[in-house]
Amino acid sequence: MIMIKKWSLFFLLFITSVFYMFSKDKQVYLYQVDPLIKVLKERNYFRDETDTIRVARGEVASVQIVVQGLTEIRNMQATVTHISSGLSKLAGATTGWVGYVRVGRSYNPPSKDIIRSVSGYFPDPIIPDSAFSIKPGEIQPLWISIPTDAATVPGLYKGTVEITGEVGKKKKAWYKEFYIRIYPVTLGKSPLYITNWSAHFNPVTLSYLNNNNPVEAYSPLYWELIGIHAKLMASHRQNVHRIYPIWHTLYTYNDGKYTFDFSRFDKEAEIFDAVGALERIEGGHLAWRSGAWDDPFFVEVPLPDNEETAQLRVSPNPKKVENGIRFTLLPVEDERAKNFITQFLPAFKQHLEQRGWLDRYMQHIADEPTAKNASSYVTISNYIHEFLPGVKVLDAVLTSKELAGAIDIWVPVLNVLHNDYAFYQDLKKEGKEIWFYTCVGPRGNYANRFIELPLNQTRYLHWINYKYDATGYLHWGLNYWVEDQLNADASRDRGRLPAGDNCIIYPGYRKLYSSIRFEAMRDGIDDYQLLKMVERKDEKRAKRYADAIIFNFNDYEASVTSFRSVRKQILDFLSQP
């Protein structure tokens, strides 16, 4: 008995010493977590989800690794050391630490799936160019992006990421393996039209990319920053771009006669076309509200800058006055408005024809017309159809029947599409295009790209596109930043905008940062294309896949595991000969 007790005591001391040595040496735990999971700062329990990442050729494989430190680790950096399958290798992998943004006020009414954060901070921006540090017990997600293309060899790839950091005075390194299966399925050009409106035309917006220093419109730096936008937008499947024809035209005016220089419009279109982000040109709005929300729309009219025109309603054009021309708002019935429209639109149409862009061009009239100001919208639409024949009119709408005949590409907000679905089905039979949009709404249980919603709902927006045969998606807020957006309260304007509504990318110094929401949106756009590929082989099967995820306009599969299962079924089916 004494001997047993001695051995028991010895064994206990041995285990204790081993545990002590282990806990002393083990300074970091690395966990793989599904990239559709938002990892809150206060989370402290993880299971290593070493599931294989599965993608088609042409998709971007995303891997999320959570670093959990048992001690303080400073200046953490990450590098993918290799990704290979036999002799085949994947190149171009990038890493970025996931940053956290503050949400000061939650939106209402909330979704049943809303994420609640005790700290008030949510993961969103991806920061690839900074070293991060963590305190003892703190967690930090790492985002890894691995691009593939049509030439990528299918197979199971094994990758390793190296994470380095300083512990005390020593630099240490930790390693984590992950697996990616590339399927023999190849994406082509996206069949879904996507536009997230960019505010880069505003000097204030561009100043946030220049250490808050002004950026002169149309300067070399201006065009450089536009090019940076175009590349990021193209890489995330944005293939429709809004360009304001009135704002980017240079005018002269003499005795009622205008001349038009469209070269600045052309340059912006060329920049986006060069990177593959201009399947369609989205002509910016020609008219604006004359006052309150339901007031009639007035047309934007450039007029000579003088005391008389200075008293007219001011256009939202950031320039206000240029080259002796003031940008004003006038009723479409005003003779000065008619004079401008009847000269500008035919000249612009001729220019689009000369550039070979007419078939790609669409024209906004005014944003979100309501039943009360629909009549002014219809009047302006008649002018557009008369002087821009063949050009489709598109707009985001908050009403339906009152605008019949005035719009060619209907973009109802998601809940309006839901409530008036039969109306939009009838429009489709007439040859109209149907898209949808989300913005500050709808809320409740509808999918959106709010920061407080699960990432799968951002991705599901484009499954909704597929299920309800809406061939495009629009959102107003690519980059409507406030000062110091990375550190600002994400629920902008005293909580009136849900967090994440105003932007889905973030500003750096002459660079842009993506977000985990923007990555999820891109992946949803790719899902749409995969569903279309299934449809071409087996329409009923494609419907079953969509129905397994999207139950209704505002009811979805919440389980990430179930979603991954359906994705695997899609890729397995498309891999069959």
Regions found by a protein language model. Give the residues of each.
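Short edge beta-strand/loop segments characteristic of extracellular beta-sandwich folds
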Residues: 64-68, 145-147
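Active-site clefts of carbohydrate-active enzymes
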Residues: 429-458
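Short, solvent-exposed loop/turn segments enriched in Ser/Thr/Gly
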Residues: 47, 58-64, 140-141, 153-160
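Bacterial Sec-dependent N-terminal signal peptides
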Residues: 1-25
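Catalytic domains of carbohydrate-active enzymes that cleave complex glycans
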Residues: 312-377, 382-398, 486-577
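Aromatic-lined carbohydrate-binding surfaces of glycoside hydrolases
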Residues: 114-115, 122-127, 131, 138, ...
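Surface-exposed binding patches on compact interaction domains or structured appendages
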Residues: 25-47, 70-144, 152
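Substrate-binding cleft of secreted/luminal carbohydrate-active enzymes
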Residues: 453-503
